[in-house]
């Protein structure tokens, strides 16, 4: 009986058929895009889809890229263990989307760049660009290893498949369609995988609601179990999740993911116009809302079923990240094929993120290292290099899964990585975009300081996790279990057993204050430290006396919504009809706004009539 504890069924033949079929479709998209685009085998076509993508598929790809297997597995467990404060990320997603669309999109389109780190060389120097690219490569490789490992560990329990077999298979499929199809294959595969992910959540919620007597019962159980206490205005920065940590810290953390992260920027600059790029971010925002809502409802459904018999406390699972897969086999085993659909959903999330990461890693490596070192490379040579680098980074990410196995809660660990590394990088970009007095000396000093601080607190938090009173895990019960399960049901390779280590360690003085800082504040701390140190060093080293910097490298008033809305009609008309003197990247047919073309055409017709 579901919810009573004990071992659950494993995959049936039909589950394997559904799972394998969906994964083969994903790989087939890569092959299709490869054959379809053979005549357009340029580096730009491979890395940016020829800059001809439209808003909706790019938006779904943006959503799928970070709504990975970690989201499919980790977010429901978050709702089950901690309740619904995670829903406050709705506000963070809205703030992040506005910042990315209205500040960063105009800047990157104006500069007509492929790698976001090209901006660092334009604004500072070559050394800072190389450092920024290297930080991104390390961050993405580690994060991608975690994305591969965490769902593989969970799927290992319910399918019985060998852990390393799942890891290698994941990397192999991603390598195939990244190598052959490039960005178009990644985007269209993401669209397909996004549909599968949402379908998996819907299946869990629907079946759970039927078993519990409706969604009203699920909601009622969650209310009395304390899972619906969403709003906490406690200003304590050590509180894991509160209104302030999520809205302030979460907004800046997600902004660092979407505004400067190559795997995301690469998608929206592949759009055919700036309007499509901005629209893709706002549609993506809605996609994030829907995905997180379904994931949270899955977690609340899981709590309603297991409120009297927690599988983790009952030792039916070896890690909290295995809770949702356990639930799937507990409630969907009587419906052949549906467990396979869910596993495909988790696996699709992993494939989506891994493929996005590999494609972005190839882009920054080629643009920031290969092209500057060998500027005479032909398009054909670059295409072969792109494919070779896809294979290389796929292998690296599989290897990094071993490092990822040493992390704890996968959702928190994944977001912590972005806060530690992307936070200081976002501070460096904001410094360059808003402060004309900032120079390369100050930028380098600020970046080094910000990174040192975030690594210090992040690694410290990993070694000495916050005490339970700060994390506020909600109570669970095993009173309704048929019997306590004393056996370990999970089969793991030896290195993954570190997840079960609970040996107490002596805690240093900083463990209960500095190291207990909410992981969502890692990014704001990195931004603030980077900008303050950079401005001080820039002032000392003559930043205000430097030669005039290119004006297109800064954010102008016209880039911001608040100023744009105040413009009179005549000012807007003048702005549209006047083509920038230095073109600012708009002379490319990809970026040339249709309105400019129409205005110039109308002006010519008026002159002809006169």
From Swiss-Prot:
Q: Which GO terms describe its biological process?
A: acetate transport; chloride transport; iodide transport; lactate transport; nicotinate transport; nitrate transmembrane transport; propanoate transmembrane transport; pyruvate transport
Check the record and name the NCBIfam families matching this protein. sss
Keywords in alphabetical order: Cell membrane, Glycoprotein, Ion transport, Membrane, Sodium, Sodium transport, Symport, Transmembrane, Transmembrane helix, Transport
What InterPro entries does the entry give?
Na/Glc_symporter_sf (IPR038377), Na/solute_symporter (IPR001734), SLC5sbd_SMCT1 (IPR041992), Sodium:Solute_Symporter_SSF (IPR051163)
Q: Where in the cell is it found?
A: Apical cell membrane
Is Glycoprotein a UniProt keyword of this protein? yes
Q: Which Pfam families match?
A: SSF
Q: Which family does it belong to?
A: Belongs to the sodium:solute symporter (SSF) (TC 2.A.21) family.
UniProt cross-references to CDD domains, sorted A to Z: SLC5sbd_SMCT1 (cd11519)
Gene Ontology MF terms in the entry: monocarboxylate:sodium symporter activity; organic acid:sodium symporter activity; secondary active monocarboxylate transmembrane transporter activity
Instruction: Specify where it is mainly localized.
Output: membrane
Kindly list the GO CC terms recorded for this protein.
Answer: apical plasma membrane
Q: How does it sit in the membrane?
A: Multi-pass membrane protein
What is the name listed in the Swiss-Prot or TrEMBL entry for this protein? Sodium-coupled monocarboxylate transporter 1
Q: State what this protein does.
A: Acts as an electrogenic sodium (Na(+)) and chloride (Cl-)-dependent sodium-coupled solute transporter, including transport of monocarboxylates (short-chain fatty acids including L-lactate, D-lactate, pyruvate, acetate, propionate, valerate and butyrate), mocarboxylate drugs (nicotinate, benzoate, salicylate and 5-aminosalicylate) and ketone bodies (beta-D-hydroxybutyrate, acetoacetate and alpha-ketoisocaproate), with a Na(+):substrate stoichiometry of between 4:1 and 2:1. Catalyzes passive carrier mediated diffusion of iodide.
Which parts of the sequence lie on the Cytoplasmic side of the lipid bilayer?
A: 32-52, 109-134, 184-193, 262-284, 364-390, 436-440, 541-610
TM segment ranges = 11-31, 53-73, 88-108, 135-155, 163-183, 194-216, 241-261, 285-305, 341-363, 391-411, 415-435, 441-461, 520-540
Give the catalysed reaction(s), semicolon-separated.
(S)-lactate(out) + 2 Na(+)(out) = (S)-lactate(in) + 2 Na(+)(in); propanoate(out) + 2 Na(+)(out) = propanoate(in) + 2 Na(+)(in); pyruvate(out) + 2 Na(+)(out) = pyruvate(in) + 2 Na(+)(in); acetate(out) + 2 Na(+)(out) = acetate(in) + 2 Na(+)(in)
